[in-house]
């Protein structure tokens, strides 16, 4: 088994408010959660996710990352995967603490709202445990599809990360 995954069950929709005004609409109380062991030091694993050069090694083509809170992350894919996907995504970086934690926001697959991705890197004797959580999906049919797409997408992405860092295999 490459890692462990959990889909947090819904406890009902949540509405986010600021000064009694709705700012994001109704969101699902569902989270994509994955964790996997990567047999490498936390700095190496972190840099493979939180730098443009690192992302381009295994996942993207031409990614850019300003790895500070308030910076931006920008993913670019060209002819990626079986569908030869070409596209871009990105958003603000909320937290960047090398080699422990990286948090950013980016567009859901539908492109109509942002989700939050939190990635923690925990050193263990045999390498680094990468724990990823993504949340903030709209409570709608489109939001559910975005959620399901990310469940499968992150499963593939963390497997690709593991194979790249441990064995130098690039997809």
Describe the residue ranges of each PLM region.
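Beta-strand/loop substructures that line and gate deep hydrophobic ligand-binding cavities in soluble
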Residues: 109-156
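Short, highly charged C-terminal tails/helix-capping segments
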Residues: 163-171
